Structures are given as C-alpha cells and as structure tokens.
C-alpha cells in the first residue's frame, strides 16, 4: 500500500505532531509527550500522552555527553529497526525492549467491548528509539523530528526555526506563524486596494490596481482556510504560494516565477522562508513606487498638485 501511495504522493511521510516534555528538557532529558508521524518507509507511529500511564512508549534519553557546549545544535531523530529478511523481527517479551528488533512486546490493560471487563494483554508495538546526531543509525529507519539549541545560561530548548519533514503544516509552529503573517499582510493590502477602488470614479479605475485586487481576492480564502485548519500538506501550501507569486509577477515584473526556490521536503524552513521573502519584497516594492498625490481644483478642468522632486 505504501509503495502505491508513494507513486502518486512522494512526500507522503513526515511528522504529524510532536511535543517534548519541557520539564525533562530543562533537565537535559529528551522525552516525547506526543509523537505522530509516518516514517520514510510508510510505518505509522503514534505516541500519545495516555501511553505515559504504561511507563512511556519510548524510553527517554539524556543528552549528557551528546550535546557539548561546542556543538551549535543537536539533532533529535526517531528510529525503528529495519525489517530483517528471515527474522527475527519481533520479541514478544516486554523485558526485551533493548533488543534491536522491529517490534517488542508491551502489556496494556484493554476493556472488553461487550462486557466492559478489563484485561491485561500483550501487544506487539514498534520498537521506536530516540537517536541523536553523530550516532550510528545503521539498521534503522530514521526521521529527524527536532533540533535542540542552547540559550542564555546554557538552557536547552527546541530550535523553533527547524521545520521537520511533515505531512501537516500544523506540525511546525513556525510554519503556522508564517502563514498567519502572510495572511495578515495580504489582507491589509487587499483592504487598502479595495478602499482606493471604492473611492475612485468609474472613469478613473486603475487597471493595475484591479489586477492586484483580483489576485489577492482569489488567494486570501485559500490561505485563510490553511491557517484555520492547519492540516494542509507543506507541498500543497508551497504550490499555493508559488501560484500566488506567479500571478503577482504579472503586476510586479521584477518578480521572476522561474526563480522561485524549489520544494525541499528536507529543508522546509529554507523553502518557505525564501518564498515569504519574495512575496514581501514584491509588496514592499509597490509601497515604494506608488505615492498618493493630493490634487486641488484650480479652475474648470484644471487641477494642481505639488510633486516632490524625489
């Protein structure tokens, strides 16, 4: 199934949601509170806060010894042992969690759907491990989910600007803020253009202004939906912004649609940061080259205005 989906959706893997325990992180310990995603090989992983009741789905790890002060940042990855042809690929023993098999046993209490009686059963679950940059990941399928950095006083925190490969833009607070920022900017531009159109007489409508207003009116509802729902795939968001940029290049010739950054699933921060800069620069160019000049009626059919030499 994964191979068939990948044929039509090559970027259908990545993080859906990830949260680290902030208290543990302050004590140099990496522990997942929530982790949902699709591994590059199509394996689904889902770790929820309720899993903590059973001692945690993934064993936490200390960063001591892995994150010296000389290191700019520390990559945090999750890994699952690759499937071994001929096995073994599972150990149905909850005490064998350190074995490098793809699946290990986990005892959980499950209520019967008919009687409601609760029983403890043994389930096989993915043997998800926490890995750090610089470690040997041979034999593991890995997904980089976060970057850690040191702040003032050596305090460890999550690097906000790192956007992991993801299947939902809500996986990255930074990406969500970027979309909201663009939405606010474009909405403000649209209101300004609409006010100018309403104030102008039918005989003095500006075709360039009409074109800009049309472009913004067509794209604002789509960006608004992405911002509210947050479930769009990053590639879908990229195509949306690329189309917006292409249409803006009609009224801003300095904006070359063939010079846009390429979509990079491994570097979403760089991709969308550059797209955001291109759009903002084009709109800023409009502010620079357009100036409102007040006219005063001198006599019939004669208007006068003071034009700055600049």
Q: Each predicted region: which residue ranges?
A:
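N-terminal "first-domain core" detector
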Residues: 1-33
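Basic, amphipathic N-terminal segments
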Residues: 18, 45-46, 59, 186
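Type-3 copper protein
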Residues: 35, 45-48, 71, 77
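Short loop/turn segments at secondary-structure transitions that flank enzyme active sites
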Residues: 43, 82-86, 154
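Terminal low-complexity "docking" segments
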Residues: 49-65, 305-310
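Elongated alpha-helical scaffolds
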Residues: 56-93, 99-101
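Mixed-charge (acidic/basic) macromolecular-recognition segments
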Residues: 100-242
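Extended, amphipathic alpha-helical scaffolds
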Residues: 225-310
């Amino acid at each position: 199934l994964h191979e068939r989906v990948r044929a039509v959706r090559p970027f259908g893997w990545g993080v859906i949601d990830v949260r680290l325990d902030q208290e543990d992180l302050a004590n140099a310990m990496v522990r997942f509170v929530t982790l949902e995603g699709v591994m590059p090989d199509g394996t689904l992983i889902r770790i929820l806060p309720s899993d903590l009741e059973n001692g945690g789905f993934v064993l936490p790890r200390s960063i001591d010894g892995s994150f010296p002060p000389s290191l700019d940042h520390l990559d945090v990855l999750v890994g699952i042992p690759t499937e071994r042809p001929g096995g073994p690929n599972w150990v149905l023993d909850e005490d064998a969690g350190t074995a490098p098999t793809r699946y290990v046993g986990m005892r959980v209490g499950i209520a019967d759907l008919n009687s409601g009686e609760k029983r403890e059963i043994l389930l096989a679950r993915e043997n998800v491990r926490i890995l750090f940059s610089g470690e040997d990941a041979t034999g593991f399928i890995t997904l980089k989910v976060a970057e850690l950095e040191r702040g003032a006083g050596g305090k460890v925190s999550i690097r906000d600007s790192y956007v992991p490969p993801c299947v939902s833009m809500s996986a990255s607070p930074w990406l969500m803020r970027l979309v909201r920022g663009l939405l606010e900017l474009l909405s403000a531009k649209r209101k300004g253009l609409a006010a100018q159109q309403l104030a102008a007489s039918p005989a003095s409508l500006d075709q360039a202004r009409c074109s800009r207003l049309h472009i913004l009116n067509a794209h604002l509802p789509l960006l608004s939906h992405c911002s509210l729902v947050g479930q769009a795939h990053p590639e879908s968001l990229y195509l949306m912004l690329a189309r917006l940029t292409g249409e803006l290049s009609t009224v801003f010739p300095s904006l070359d649609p063939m010079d846009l950054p390429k979509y990079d699933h491994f570097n979403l921060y760089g991709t969308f940061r550059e797209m955001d800069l291109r759009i903002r620069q084009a709109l800023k160019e409009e502010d620079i080259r357009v100036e409102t000049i007040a006219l005063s009626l001198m006599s019939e059919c004669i208007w006068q205005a003071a034009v700055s030499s600049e």
